[in-house]
Amino acid sequence: MKEPDLKKIRKAMEKELDPKRYEHTLGVAYTAASLAMCYGADLNSALIAGMLHDCAKCLSNEKKISICKKHDLPINPAEEKNPFLLHAKVGSYLASKKYGVTDPDILNAILNHTTGRPDMSLLEKIVWLSDYIEPGRKQAPNLPEIRRIAFEDLDKALIMALENTLSYLKGGNMEIDSMTQKTYDLSLIHISEPTRLRRIS
């Protein structure tokens, strides 16, 4: 089935998101597109996933919880304590039901863009990292270096960003989703393997 028109999605996001979130969304979408070209991923899928990754971000926590309960979307302990984390899960649901996305890889990229998951697909890695390095981000440690490495060795950049994320959460005594920790731990194992994702030469 044909995926939804990107122009329509962009107009919908401009309407649904606040200005700051919309600018971030554009940054993620275009960064994802750049990484997709670098690593040979599908360009349109990267743009759609990037454009929709935060489509539920501006919903209230109450609304996100309501959607999860109404449509039997599971809520884990970390999400119960921090309902804002539900925006990825709800966003993936809305991408399918409201915006007409049918590609499972796009839906998974939206679903896992906050926590990551072990054995992410190329598109999932691209969207996760694009959310971290897009031009509007300013304060993450070693950000210029991670941005540079992202276009040379995707897995290495992913590890660096995951390390920073876990360090930030631990330093602030904040809840760490078990999936993020698993993603980091397994990525450390896989990074030494010959399947590391490097730019197309």
Where do the PLM segments sit?
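Divalent metal-dependent catalytic cores for phosphoryl transfer on phosphate-bearing substrates
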Residues: 10-16, 38-160
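Long, amphipathic alpha-helical surface segments
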Residues: 156-172
